[in-house]
Structure formats: structure tokens, C-alpha cells
């Protein structure tokens, strides 16, 4: 075992939330992030209908189930197969949340439009700041777009974002679709992590504007004829050319801002 591996193992052994999650049979330490976010912002209530985007390995599904109880309902979507949870009101679908057929499958399972959309998904981390920031923005904008398609009016939204040059622009974009937008970092997030959570409270019912002048929307790959959005990061495949293009866009926006 190398030094990095030993350091990682030691870090996990000393990680309060990792040990707590293991003790209480939660699949991820991230479970406690959702508990803390909900405690602060009152996003999810008992009996709510919830959709979890990028739900693997299932930690947020477990947290949401603990909050909504047996009379709520939760559907998760992820590219990976998620091991079933022992609850009749929690279902995980394998698929791409940007695909209409997957969204239809989720909608068909739901008893009504969701009260809350949650997303703790992360793109593949390259270690290159601009690339990771761009991938994160692409993924979180996909989540926002999906939320505007599914949420009931007045519903809530929470998504993980990596900090960077365009972080505030993303928060501004969220505020266009919700009455209030907040940012926070729960106690369970590691101090060294660049992750921040963006909260949208009370969906105003607006449809996502793919022609928006927002610099965040311009980062997306679009089909100009059909206006369909593709998500290389969501498929966990992104070429060097795609990465370079996103970095170029971010640098151009950065220079304009300066």
C-alpha cells in the first residue's frame, strides 16, 4: 500500500461522519450532509415526494426516506446500478437524467409531481481546477434543467456545486427559477473540499430557457436544430477537446469580467 493509500485509510478511520454512517448502516457519509441541509433550510418534509438525481450509492436516498417516512415517496436516478433499499416507497432507476425516456419513467412511478429535487452528483475529478469547475457547472445545470421539468410549483431544489469563477453566476441562474437562492457548506463537508450546496426555495414554475444569455447555459453542448442538451460529464466520458473548449470558455468569461 502506497503512502497516499495509507493516508486515505487513516483519514477514513478518523472521519467522524464516515464512522457514524458505518455504525448506522448508511451507505455514505454524505447522508449527514442532507440531514444538515434539511435541518437548516427545511427542504424536505414528512410525506413529501422526492427525486434524487445521481443517487448512487444511495446515502441521500436513505436520508430522504428517514425524513419523508413511510407515507412519502422517493425515486432516484443514476447511471450506475443502485442496490435496492428495503423500502417499498424508494425506487432507483438506472439511466441518464437528461434523457426524456428516463424522466418519463420516473414520472410514471411518482404518485404526483415531486416536492423536492435533490442532487449530490459529482463529475469525474481530473485534478485540473478549470476542468473540474466546468464539469461541475455542466452537471449542476443539467440538474437545474431537470428540476424545472419535474418540480411542482413551490417545490425546493438542492444541488452540489464546485466553487470557481462562475459559481456566483450559477447561483444567479438558480434564482431565476426560485423565489430564493442560498449557498451553504454543511458541517459534514470536509474542510478541504471545494463543494458548496446551492439551495432553491419555492419553484416559480418557469421553464428552463436554453436560449438564456447566462454564461452558465452557454457552457452546455447543444444541438442547434433540436435544442437537445448532451452531457459528456453525466456519461462520465469527456474528451480532451471538450475539456479544452470548456476551459477556453471559462477563461474568456474571466477575462471579460476583469
UniProtKB/Swiss-Prot annotation:
A Pfam family found in this protein is: FtsJ
Record's keyword terms, sorted: Cytoplasm, Methyltransferase, rRNA processing, S-adenosyl-L-methionine, Transferase
Q: Does the keyword Methyltransferase apply?
A: yes
Q: What is its EC number?
A: 2.1.1.166
Task: Identify the InterPro entries for this entry.
Answer: RNA_methyltr_RlmE, RNA_MeTrfase_FtsJ_dom, rRNA-MeTfrase_E, SAM-dependent_MTases_sf
Give its localization. Answer: Cytoplasm
The protein's matches in CDD domains, at most eight in alphabetical order, are given as:
capping_2-OMTase_viral
What residues does S-adenosyl-L-methionine bind to? 58, 60, 78, 96, 120
**The UniProt record lists the keyword rRNA processing:** yes
Domain of life (superkingdom) = Archaea
> What reactions does this protein catalyze?
uridine(2552) in 23S rRNA + S-adenosyl-L-methionine = 2'-O-methyluridine(2552) in 23S rRNA + S-adenosyl-L-homocysteine + H(+)
Record GO cellular component, one term: cytoplasm
Q: Care to name a GO molecular-function term for this sequence?
A: rRNA (uridine-2'-O-)-methyltransferase activity
Query: Where along the chain is the active site annotated?
Result: 160 (proton acceptor)
Q: What does this protein do?
A: Specifically methylates the uridine in position 2552 of 23S rRNA at the 2'-O position of the ribose in the fully assembled 50S ribosomal subunit.
HAMAP family under this entry?
A: RNA_methyltr_E
Q: What family does this chain come from, according to its entry?
A: Belongs to the class I-like SAM-binding methyltransferase superfamily. RNA methyltransferase RlmE family.
The protein's name in its UniProt record: Ribosomal RNA large subunit methyltransferase E
Q: Which organism is it from?
A: Methanococcus maripaludis (strain C7 / ATCC BAA-1331)
Amino acid at each position: 500500500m502506497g503512502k497516499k493509500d495509507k493516508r486515505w485509510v487513516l483519514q477514513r478511520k478518523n472521519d467522524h461522519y464516515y464512522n457514524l454512517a458505518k455504525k448506522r448502516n448508511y451507505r455514505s457519509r454524505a447522508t449527514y450532509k442532507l440531514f444538515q441541509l434539511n435541518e437548516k433550510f427545511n427542504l424536505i418534509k414528512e410525506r413529501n415526494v422526492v427525486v434524487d438525481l445521481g443517487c448512487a450509492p444511495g446515502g441521500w436516498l436513505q436520508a430522504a426516506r428517514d425524513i419523508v417516512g413511510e407515507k412519502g415517496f422517493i425515486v432516484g436516478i443514476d447511471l450506475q446500478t443502485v442496490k435496492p433499499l428495503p423500502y417499498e416507497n424508494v425506487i432507483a432507476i438506472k439511466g441518464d437524467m437528461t434523457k426524456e425516456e428516463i424522466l418519463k419513467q420516473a414520472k410514471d412511478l411518482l404518485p404526483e409531481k415531486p416536492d423536492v429535487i435533490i442532487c449530490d452528483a459529482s463529475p469525474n475529478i481530473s485534478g485540473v481546477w478549470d476542468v473540474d469547475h466546468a464539469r461541475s457547472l455542466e452537471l449542476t445545470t443539467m440538474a437545474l434543467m431537470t428540476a424545472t421539468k419535474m418540480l411542482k410549483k413551490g417545490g425546493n431544489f438542492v444541488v452540489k456545486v464546485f466553487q470557481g469563477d462562475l459559481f456566483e453566476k450559477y447561483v444567479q441562474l438558480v434564482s431565476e427559477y426560485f423565489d430564493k437562492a442560498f449557498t451553504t457548506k454543511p458541517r459534514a463537508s470536509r474542510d478541504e473540499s471545494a463543494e458548496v450546496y446551492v439551495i432553491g426555495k419555492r419553484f416559480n414554475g418557469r421553464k428552463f430557457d436554453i436560449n438564456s444569455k447566462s454564461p452558465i447555459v452557454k457552457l452546455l453542448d447543444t444541438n442547434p436544430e433540436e435544442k437537445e442538451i448532451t452531457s459528456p460529464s453525466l456519461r462520465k466520458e469527456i474528451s480532451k477537446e471538450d475539456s479544452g473548449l470548456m476551459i477556453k470558455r471559462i477563461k474568456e468569461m474571466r477575462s471579460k469580467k476583469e
